[in-house]
Amino acid sequence: MAGNRSTDIKVHCSFCGKSQDEVKKIIAGNNVFICNECVLLSQEIIKEELAEEVLADLTEVPKPKELLDVLNQYVVGQDRAKRALAVAVYNHYKRISFSESRDEEEVELQKSNILMIGPTGSGKTFLAQTLAKSLNVPFAIADATSLTEAGYVGEDVENILLKLIQAADYNVERAERGIIYVDEIDKIAKKGENVSITRDVSGEGVQQALLKIIEGTVASVPPQGGRKHPNQEMIQIDTKNILFIVGGAFDGIEEIVKQRLGEKIIGFGQNSRKIDEDASYMQEIISDDIQKFGLIPEFIGRLPVVAALEQLNIDDLIQILTVPKNALVKQYQALLSYDGVELSFDQDALEAIAAKAIERKTGARGLRSIIEETMLDIMFEIPSQEDVVKVRITKESVNGDAKPILETA
């Protein structure tokens, strides 16, 4: 507590030696005293050291091949997209680590944010999560459909930054090197190429608001979220080194690509390549197609890296179920092993699960719910049936035509 100035005994700070008369407050500990000035100084020292630790971590960024190896352990397929992401992420953090020591005369490297285009359940969110985890940087996910421009009911774009700050345990320096994934970005596309005379609360206005933080600015973030209020204390965060990955399904964009490629054939006649109807038009997307879909040119310009993900087929989904380190089949096998039960899936059972996910158009994200439906009764009964040692999931049990096969001791 503060020293009493009315006594004859003068208390001095154990660190700087100043007396209680020379400072505003002295705090007493166990045979030690510290003044308010030394408290502030120590806070600054700790802050600087933490910032240096963050920068030190970034000097050891995994190379693109190493990042790809990590992604391959957890993500099935999407090889082109994974390579594009690995290169973009490596270049981003290399840019940060070298910009701190860059001379003014040297070339200034601009930030390369990423746009991922692919159908629902193709792995967009999981790819971003896996990258952030492998780099040990803060990560936040936001849904573009919940955002509105300032002055309208909804969530301010600055609240995206608050999620990242919270993921960094309110360490702003660490958050400034984090990754933000904004999903459903295609849902804030303009509803056509003609500019509407009415206010576009959730479309172009949100793109403009996102543009500011994506390209790099010092933003003021309410520490408790919500709308900003006058005289409210704010957290200042510089977004110039935050990597933004945005993703969306962009349903219908392949028709825009087909139209563009078809027009090219008409324009150049037989010298132009013939469009293969079975080809993946998603790999042919260019910025003009994205603009025609409804994203504004300025926004597209801040997303120079475009990674197109393909629709997952049955074989891809079966691999997702069984191959990765954290594959769903392995997870459920581990769950039942805690009860002393061995779990197995027939090959045609895996095919049935994958077929259901494709039928429901949920892709990889729908696999868990299908397994849960199949195994609900088993997971309810097994803990009480101590004589059961094996459970076998068949195609019939996945389709609801029979129960899983149990084997007892």
From Swiss-Prot:
This protein's name: ATP-dependent Clp protease ATP-binding subunit ClpX
Domain ClpX-type ZB per the UniProt entry, residue ranges: 1-54
GO molecular-function term, one example from the UniProt record: ATP-dependent protein folding chaperone
InterPro entries: AAA+_ATPase, ATP-dep_Clp_protease_ClpX, ATPase_AAA_core, Clp_ATPase_C, Clp_protease_ATP-bd_su_ClpX, ClpX_bact, P-loop_NTPase, Znf_CppX_C4
HAMAP family for this protein: ClpX
Positions of ATP binding: P119, T120, G121, S122, G123, K124, T125, F126
Family, similarity comment: Belongs to the ClpX chaperone family.
Source taxon at top rank: Bacteria
Quaternary context: Component of the ClpX-ClpP complex. Forms a hexameric ring that, in the presence of ATP, binds to fourteen ClpP subunits assembled into a disk-like structure with a central cavity, resembling the structure of eukaryotic proteasomes.
Binding residues for Zn(2+): C13, C16, C35, C38
